[in-house]
């Protein structure tokens, strides 16, 4: 379970998150809904530890993310998958290498097993045929699917998706 307790975040005197609290139950789909510019992305970045709130707590099964050192935060990140709004693929890596990136960072499996897992994830999003292509060689929708494959590569306990359906056609959105 993730508990967000009274977090506040400001940038240059402008408050983006003001005393936000929420509980996200394990095993359930939780949605953060709001209009453009309302702070949804900032909230997600705080929840995953890419930003630190000015005040408040973010608890993962009782462990406070805001007080974790770098090593503890890296251990927690092994349990997370993140789909960023703009896909955030590495331009210098192939689609397969992008999906393998979190596996290479956090998995102790053999290279062959990491590659097999990455291909499985690409197959899940119907993108196995693009494994050797670079992000500049694929469409926006294909980039989004590659980013989804990367987000699920570690079979994360927590999966965070920022605008998961943007750039996808309706049929692919249903598949995802």
What are these regions (language model features)?
Residues 63-64, 111-129:
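Conserved ABC ATPase "signature" region
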Residues 56-64:
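Conserved ABC transporter NBD signature motif
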Residues 134-138, 142:
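Conserved ABC ATPase signature
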């Amino acid at each position: 379970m993730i508990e967000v307790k009274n977090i506040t975040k400001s940038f240059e005197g402008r408050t983006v998150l003001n005393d936000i609290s929420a509980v996200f139950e394990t095993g359930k789909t939780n949605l953060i809904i709001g209009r453009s510019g309302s702070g949804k992305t900032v909230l997600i970045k705080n929840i995953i530890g890419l930003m630190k709130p000015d005040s408040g707590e973010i608890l993962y099964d009782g462990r406070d993310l805001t007080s974790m050192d770098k090593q503890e935060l890296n251990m927690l990140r092994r349990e997370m998958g993140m789909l960023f709004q703009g896909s955030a693929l590495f331009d210098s890596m192939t689609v397969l290498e992008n999906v393998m990136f979190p596996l290479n960072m956090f998995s102790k499996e053999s290279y062959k097993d990491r590659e097999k897992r990455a291909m499985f994830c690409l197959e899940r999003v119907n993108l196995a045929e693009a494994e050797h292509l670079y992000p500049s060689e694929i469409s926006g929708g294909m980039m989004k699917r590659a980013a989804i494959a990367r987000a699920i590569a570690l079979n994360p306990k927590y999966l965070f998706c920022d605008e998961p359906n943007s750039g996808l056609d309706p049929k692919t959105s249903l598949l995802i």
